[in-house]
Each structure stands twice: as C-alpha cells, then as structure tokens.
C-alpha cells in the first residue's frame, strides 16, 4: 500500500471543539432502539475524499468502508475511533531544501507513491529533524500509515510498524515538542492508531517496559487544552491501560504518576458525551482493586461528579459506565453516595429502557440500601415494587434485596409500602415463586431461592415497627401453607427468615387457628417445627454454622415459636404428642428436646430462658407434666439454676416457677392418691426414673453427644442431609444443591413440592396423629382484608392470586 504525499491535514482550531469520539454499543440494533446517541455534525468534504485514492480515515471516519476493529481488541472501551471536522487542503509548498529531505523516501517507479515498508525508517529519521515543519509532515505521514494498518480493509498482510524505535521517537516528540501542539497532536494520533491493533499494543507495552517515561509524558498532555490535545492523550492512555494482557505495568506506572488527579477534572469540564465514557472507563481502570486511587477520587469529589452526569446526560453508554463506576464505590464508601442523594438520583435510572443500565443501577442501589437515611424514598420504593415482578430473574432478585434493606428499621418506608399495595404485591410474588420453584434447576433454582428469601425477609420487616403491623401479619398469613412449604424444604437461610416471620405472626391469637389447621399432606406446622428443632439439636456439637446460618439461631427460633403457640390448648396437645414421640423424647441420655437444649453448654442464655418458659407452659399439660416431673436431670438443673439467682436472676425466677408447679402437682397427686391408697399400690407396675435408666443401660446403649447414635430413627438424620445445601453462599463453587437432584425426601410418603389439595382438612384424620379441632365455621378474621389501599377480594382475575390446583 502506498501513500499519496500530496495531501495533508490542515486542522482549524475553530473546528477542534467539534471532535467526537464514538463508543460503540454491544450491538448496532440496540443503539437504534435506545435512540440515545448524540448527533454529530456531517462531514463537508466526504465527496472530495471519495475522488482520491487514499483516505486516512482520521478525518472522514467512513465506517461503511473501514469498520473499526477496536471493539474486538478492547471490549471494555468499544471505542471505534476519532472523527474531526478538519478541512482537507493540498500541502502548503515547502521550501526546496525541506522537500529534498523527503527525496530519500523510496517511491514505486510505476505510480510515484511512497512505499510504506521503506518509508518507515526514513520517516523515523525525519521525525528527529531539527526543522519542525519537516517533523510535522513526517509524523503526519506516519499517522496515516498507522491508521491504515489498524483498518482491516486497508492494511496489507504484513504489519509495517514493528520497530520499537518508532515508539521511542514518538516518546521523544511528546517530551521535546511541547511548544508545538500540531506535532503533539499528530504524535498522539499515531500512538492511538498503533494501539488499535493487538500487535501495536504489544509493541507499545514492550517499549514502555524499556522506557517507562512514555506514560508520564502521556499524562503530562492530559492537561493540555490547546488543539484538543487532551482528548488524544486520554484516548491513547485508555487504549494502553485497558489492555488486559500487558496493561498491568502501565496501570501501575500511571497510578504512581497520579494520573487520576489529571483525569478526574474532565468529568465536569468535558462536554462531549462520547468522550466522557472513555474518561469514566479510564478512571475505573485506575481505581480497580486499589484503595489509594479510590481515596484520591473521593477526595476530588469524583462520586458527586458521576451523580451529576446521571442527572444531566442522556447517552445510554455514558449512563451505564457511570453506574458501573459508582457500583465500585458503593462497596467502598456507601455513606458518601447516600449523603449526596445517590439513592434518589439512581432511582430515576430504574425507568430507563436499557436492561443493562437498570441492572447496573439496581446492583449499586442494593449495595447502598443498608445505609440509614432520612431522605424520602417513595420514588425508589415505587420503582422497586414495579420491578419485583420482572421477567428478568436478576432484576427482580436485586429489587427484592434492595427493598428488604430499605424497609428494615425504617418506619416511613414501611408505612409507604403498606399504604401502596406493597404487601399485596410481595405476597403475590412469593406465591408465584413458590408455585414455579419446582420448575427450575441448578442456577435458576438458586436465584429463585434467593428471591424467595428476600421476599420473606421483606415481609418479616413489614410485620413489625408500624401501626399497621397486626393487619400486615394477618394478610401475610392468609396462605399459611406457603410458609409451611418453606419449612419443609429444610434450607437453612429460608428456615431462618421463615421462622422469624412466624415468630411475629403467632403473637396474634386470631392467627393460631390457621397455624393449627394448615396441612401439607399430613404434615403441620407443629410437627415440622419440632422436626427442625430435633435436627438442629443433633448438630449443636458438630458444627456451629451451616451455609452462613448459625445452628443456635435455628434452635432459638424454634423454641421461641413453641413457647408462644403453647398458650393455645389445642396446639399444646399437639406439641405434647410430638415431643413425647420416641424420636423426640430420647435425645442424649433419654430426655425430651427442651431438656436436651438446657443441657447444652454452648446454648446462649436467651435460648435457655425461652426453653424454661416453654417448659413452664408444658407443665400445664397433664401428660407432659408427668413426663417432665419424672426427669431427675431436669429437677437437678432447675435447683441448680435457682441457686444462681445472683448471676442469672431471670433464669432463677423461671426455674422457681417451674419447681412451684411441680410441687403443686405433687401435692394434688398426694391428696388424690391418699383417697385410693398409696402411690405404689396404684402404680407399682410402672418403672420409676432410676429403674428406666437401668433398663436402658442394661441393653448396652450409650447416649452421648446430640443423639446421633440412635439407630432408629436418628441415625440418618444429620444436619447436612436434612438441611439441603443453601444457595449462593460461595459463588466460587459450582452450585449443586441436593434439593434439585432428587434427594431422599424427609417424608417419603408425601410430595416435596406444593400440594394440589386444600391446605387443611376439616375432617378427622385416620392416622395416629393428633386431630386438629374442628371449626364449624372458620372465617378469616376481619383484619385480613383491611390493608390500606386494599379494597378486599377483587372479582377481577388480574387482581387475584395466580390460579393453582386448589389451595395449599
């Protein structure tokens, strides 16, 4: 390929302000849909260039003939090139002496054009000439060669600029020709075009390893406004630093030279919406995984400048890159972003038509949503309520997680959610997620589990801390089988949040009826709660944490719920039935679950306090009271706790109350037995506690640890088998949850998925399980349909819950 020496670029300073820089989208069709690309002025002399046999591409940017390859080389920048409004004129006549210096460049005898292969060494020498006009022409021709080589349609098979001496010479020009802006501009343009191909990047980075001062000279010109030199310097710097293979050394040098201090001011000063994305991405590269650079950026007001860009600009690519950079600082200095109104500004981005912009915005919002703020956030909450049912799984997940953080410990946000159908939307979303759960596998199932977890957590926050809390609890528990299903999945994180929500719900007497009546198959809440408690107890001495959830927390929540629900006589009967079942009454040395919990030294004091309150409630059941009274270990522990009143007054008081109940019961029995003979004559055939222990020991069985030695049915009931592997706790590992690969079901006779039948059976069961009380007329309490802005059950299909094969 040959060059026409009769053309030169004559840049007019009045047109330099119109130079634009194109940041290509991921796909051309997406750019057309968004319609956000700022218009650029037309080229006035395209027709003239079409009549010449060479087009450098620098001025016309004729993409239809010469598509850029920078997108494939630097996917992070997607920079297609530079355009200019420069005029093209014949080269001004050089003096004869100046022309003679170019006579040494070899020409082809056929067409009289310069031969690029042989011209490069000559041009390299001419760029060292003392005559600045000669240097300018030489570097201009070198720039045209570099532009031709980065053009896939114009370059020859063999790369021509391969000599590091070319880079060193360009470096010298950047250092020595500071007073000649045209030379500097052509030099930077040459470097930029060389960096537009991978071979050129390798050449430049090798030169930098030999002469590191190339980077400082580039940084020096970032602050040069004349002839828009700073634009060329920023583009060239970005091309070098964004190379993923060899850019690391250059990034280190740039950080040492405080490049970020020179680049950051242009976020505010630059007007071009196409150069700003390059500046933002350059800052991202400099700040990536470097705390010092982030601190400098924050001190210079960088986050505020980015938020200002989001408010004032409309170019989608610029907005997306700005949110990507803000996402980095959301994990570094979240309070700073919130203090400058970051949540309110980012909320405006959620209605944008770009999915990647919405997703990036949501991720940033999620990272700063846990920061307390007194600012109004109605717009943000409204947008999140719309996105929580999005078809995009990641968008709805981030929306739910952000919403959960916003309503936690924030009364105004809770009241807004309750008065704007927030509870209704969340319950509907949870019902849909529960219905669709069994249709997903692996990664999709993991996302669905995280989504359900966030919804339950949000509902739990809405159940307390505001005047409408009781009404919300009643509305949330209209379909109790959803939460029973979550308990039956035995997923640690879901268990924790579901148990927390149930702890709020069962505080209402009106909600104990659906709690008792709800069934999936034959499994009810009480049986499942006791099963979870038993499985957790077996792991107290084995492992403290399972997938981020403390086993102690599961034990404490189960005890708390059992303590609250046993105030109901019907539920107390059911609790007694399951606690005295063989698998639950032979924990450790043959004790029931509450006594086993009291024995564990690693259980916290608040858990022991709740356990004593549960035992106190159980003492009001005749059969369970007999069972507890015969346990000598329990009596010894109660006396021991009572004697430690100075250190644990609350526990001592509870122990004293239980011992008082036991004493009163013995007194009643003594009076009763006195009428009909001695206790031994009436019940002499029964074994007392000591005899029972001797019988157990006579079989040679030992009861140590957490009951894991029981052959039936405890031997196969380890935590890791019963608690399925929860989702997303270690993103570095492949998600392979046993829940989604058909593990042995906890209850083989019942399906794992949501049932198709009604959620409770008004008729008596034929099994040996306790029969729930029959309610002749069971209606929802009036508060169910009294949520603000909820006009009660709607007859319109779109306002009802999704259709199911019957209720759970």
UniProtKB/Swiss-Prot annotation:
<dbReference type="InterPro" id="IPR013284">
    <property type="entry name" value="Beta-catenin"/>
</dbReference>
<feature type="compositionally biased region" description="Polar residues">
    <location>
        <begin position="723"/>
        <end position="736"/>
    </location>
</feature>
<feature type="region of interest" description="Involved in transcriptional activation">
    <location>
        <begin position="541"/>
        <end position="808"/>
    </location>
</feature>
<dbReference type="GO" id="GO:0045294">
    <property type="term" value="F:alpha-catenin binding"/>
</dbReference>
<keyword id="KW-0879">Wnt signaling pathway</keyword>
<feature type="repeat" description="ARM 2">
    <location>
        <begin position="165"/>
        <end position="209"/>
    </location>
</feature>
<dbReference type="InterPro" id="IPR011989">
    <property type="entry name" value="ARM-like"/>
</dbReference>
<feature type="region of interest" description="Involved in transcriptional activation">
    <location>
        <begin position="1"/>
        <end position="85"/>
    </location>
</feature>
<keyword id="KW-0472">Membrane</keyword>
<feature type="compositionally biased region" description="Polar residues">
    <location>
        <begin position="786"/>
        <end position="798"/>
    </location>
</feature>
<dbReference type="GO" id="GO:0019903">
    <property type="term" value="F:protein phosphatase binding"/>
</dbReference>
<dbReference type="GO" id="GO:0016342">
    <property type="term" value="C:catenin complex"/>
</dbReference>
<dbReference type="GO" id="GO:0005912">
    <property type="term" value="C:adherens junction"/>
</dbReference>
<dbReference type="GO" id="GO:0016922">
    <property type="term" value="F:nuclear receptor binding"/>
</dbReference>
<dbReference type="GO" id="GO:0045296">
    <property type="term" value="F:cadherin binding"/>
</dbReference>
<keyword id="KW-0804">Transcription</keyword>
<feature type="repeat" description="ARM 1">
    <location>
        <begin position="118"/>
        <end position="160"/>
    </location>
</feature>
<feature type="compositionally biased region" description="Low complexity">
    <location>
        <begin position="737"/>
        <end position="750"/>
    </location>
</feature>
<comment type="function">
    <text>Participates in the Wnt signaling pathway which affects cell fate and may regulate the stem cell divisions of seam cells during larval development. Functions as a transcriptional activator but is dependent on the interaction with pop-1. Involved in maintaining lin-39 Hox expression and regulating glr-1 abundance at the synapses. Required for mab-5 expression during Q neuroblast migration and for oxidative stress-induced daf-16 signaling.</text>
</comment>
<feature type="region of interest" description="Disordered">
    <location>
        <begin position="702"/>
        <end position="808"/>
    </location>
</feature>
<keyword id="KW-0805">Transcription regulation</keyword>
<keyword id="KW-0217">Developmental protein</keyword>
<keyword id="KW-0963">Cytoplasm</keyword>
<dbReference type="GO" id="GO:0060070">
    <property type="term" value="P:canonical Wnt signaling pathway"/>
</dbReference>
<protein>
    <recommendedName>
        <fullName>Beta-catenin/armadillo-related protein 1</fullName>
    </recommendedName>
</protein>
<dbReference type="GO" id="GO:0030054">
    <property type="term" value="C:cell junction"/>
</dbReference>
<dbReference type="GO" id="GO:0098609">
    <property type="term" value="P:cell-cell adhesion"/>
</dbReference>
<keyword id="KW-0539">Nucleus</keyword>
<dbReference type="GO" id="GO:0045944">
    <property type="term" value="P:positive regulation of transcription by RNA polymerase II"/>
</dbReference>
<dbReference type="GO" id="GO:0005634">
    <property type="term" value="C:nucleus"/>
</dbReference>
<dbReference type="GO" id="GO:0003713">
    <property type="term" value="F:transcription coactivator activity"/>
</dbReference>
<comment type="similarity">
    <text>Belongs to the beta-catenin family.</text>
</comment>
<dbReference type="GO" id="GO:0001708">
    <property type="term" value="P:cell fate specification"/>
</dbReference>
<feature type="repeat" description="ARM 3">
    <location>
        <begin position="369"/>
        <end position="408"/>
    </location>
</feature>
<keyword id="KW-0965">Cell junction</keyword>
<keyword id="KW-0677">Repeat</keyword>
<dbReference type="InterPro" id="IPR000225">
    <property type="entry name" value="Armadillo"/>
</dbReference>
<comment type="subunit">
    <text>Interacts with apr-1, axl-1, daf-16, lin-23, and pop-1 (via acidic region in N-terminus 1-44). Interacts (via ARM repeats) with pry-1.</text>
</comment>
<dbReference type="InterPro" id="IPR016024">
    <property type="entry name" value="ARM-type_fold"/>
</dbReference>
<keyword id="KW-0010">Activator</keyword>
<dbReference type="GO" id="GO:0005737">
    <property type="term" value="C:cytoplasm"/>
</dbReference>
């Amino acid at each position: 390929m040959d060059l026409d020496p009769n053309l030169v670029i004559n840049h007019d300073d009045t047109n330099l302000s119109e130079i634009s820089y194109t940041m290509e989208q991921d796909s051309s069709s997406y750019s057309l849909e968004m319609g956000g690309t700022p218009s650029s002025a037309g080229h006035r002399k395209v027709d003239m260039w079409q009549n010449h046999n060479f087009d450098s591409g620098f001025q016309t940017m004729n993409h239809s003939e010469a598509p850029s390859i920078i997108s494939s080389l630097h996917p992070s920048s997607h920079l297609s090139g530079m355009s200019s409004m420069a005029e093209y004129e014949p080269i001004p006549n050089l003096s004869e002496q100046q022309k003679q210096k170019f006579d040494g460049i070899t020409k082809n005898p056929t067409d009289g054009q310069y031969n690029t292969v042989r011209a490069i060494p000559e041009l390299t020498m001419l760029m060292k000439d003392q005559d600045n006009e000669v240097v300018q022409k030489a570097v201009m021709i070198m720039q045209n060669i570099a532009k031709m080589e980065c053009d896939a349609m114009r370059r020859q098979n063999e790369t021509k600029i391969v000599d590091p001496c070319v880079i060193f010479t360009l470096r010298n020009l950047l250092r020595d020709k500071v007073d000649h802006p045209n030379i500097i501009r052509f030099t930077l343009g040459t470097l930029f075009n060389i960096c537009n191909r991978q071979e050129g990047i390798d050449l430049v980075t090798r030169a930098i390893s030999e002469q590191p001062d190339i980077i400082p000279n580039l940084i020096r010109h970032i602050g040069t406004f004349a002839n828009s030199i700073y634009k060329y310097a920023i583009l060239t710097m970005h091309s070098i630093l964004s190379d993923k293979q060899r850019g690391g050394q250059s990034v280190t040098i740039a950080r040492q030279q405080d490049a970020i201090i020179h680049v950051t001011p242009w976020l505010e000063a630059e007007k071009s919406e196409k150069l700003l994305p390059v500046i933002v991405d350059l800052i991202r590269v400099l700040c990536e995984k470097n705390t010092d650079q982030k601190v400098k950026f924050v001190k210079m007001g960088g986050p505020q400048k980015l938020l200002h860009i989001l408010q004032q600009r409309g170019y989608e690519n610029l907005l997306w890159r700005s949110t990507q950079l803000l996402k980095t600082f959301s994990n570094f200095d979240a309070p700073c972003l919130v203090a400058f109104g970051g949540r309110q500004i980012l909320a405006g981005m959620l209605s944008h038509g770009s999915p990647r912009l919405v997703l990036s915005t949501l991720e940033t919002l999620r990272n700063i949503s846990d920061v307390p703020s007194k600012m109004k956030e109605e717009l943000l909450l409204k947008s999140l309520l719309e996105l929580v049912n999005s078809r995009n799984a990641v968008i709805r997940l981030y929306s739910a997680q952000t919403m959960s953080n916003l309503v936690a410990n924030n009364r105004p946000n809770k009241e807004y959610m309750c008065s704007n159908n927030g509870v209704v939307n969340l319950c509907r979303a949870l019902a849909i997620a529960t219905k669709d759960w069994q249709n997903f596998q692996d990664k999709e199932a993991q996302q669905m589990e995280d989504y359900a977890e966030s919804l339950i957590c949000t509902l739990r926050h809405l159940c307390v801390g505001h005047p409408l809390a009781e009404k919300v609890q009643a509305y949330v528990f209209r379909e109790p089988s959803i939460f029973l299903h979550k308990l039956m999945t035995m997923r640690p994180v879901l268990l924790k949040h579901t148990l927390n929500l149930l702890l709020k719900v069962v505080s209402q007497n009106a909600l104990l009826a659906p709690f008792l009546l709800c069934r999936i198959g034959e499994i009810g809440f009480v049986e499942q709660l006791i099963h979870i408690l038993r499985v957790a107890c077996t792991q107290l001495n084995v492992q403290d944490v399972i997938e981020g959830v403390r086993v102690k927390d599961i034990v404490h929540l189960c005890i708390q719920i059992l303590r609250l629900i046993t105030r109901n006589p019907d539920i107390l009967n059911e609790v007694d039935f399951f606690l005295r079942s063989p698998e639950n009454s032979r924990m450790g040395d043959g004790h029931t679950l509450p006594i086993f919990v009291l024995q564990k030294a690693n259980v916290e004091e608040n858990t022991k306090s709740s356990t004593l309150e549960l035992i106190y409630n159980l003492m009001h059941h005749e059969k369970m009271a007999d069972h507890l009274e015969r346990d000598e270990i329990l009596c010894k522990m109660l006396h021991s706790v009572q004697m430690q009143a100075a250190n644990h007054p609350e526990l001592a008081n509870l122990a004293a109350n239980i011992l008082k109940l036991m004493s009163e019961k013995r007194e009643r029995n003594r009076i009763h037995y006195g009428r009909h003979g001695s206790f031994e004559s009436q019940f002499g055939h029964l074994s007392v506690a000591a005899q029972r222990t001797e019988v157990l020991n006579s079989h040679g069985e030992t009861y140590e640890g957490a009951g894991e030695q029981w052959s039936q049915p405890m031997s196969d009931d380890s935590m890791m088998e019963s608690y399925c592997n929860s989702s997303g706790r270690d993103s570095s590992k492949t998600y392979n949850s046993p829940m989604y690969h058909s593990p042995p079901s906890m209850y083989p006779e019942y399906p794992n998925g949501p049932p198709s039948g009604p959620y409770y059976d008004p008729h008596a069961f034929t099994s040996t399980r306790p029969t729930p009380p029959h309610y002749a007329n069971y209606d929802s309490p009036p508060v169910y349909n009294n949520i603000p802005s909820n006009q009660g059950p709607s007859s319109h299909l779109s306002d009802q819950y999704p259709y199911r094969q019957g209720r759970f």
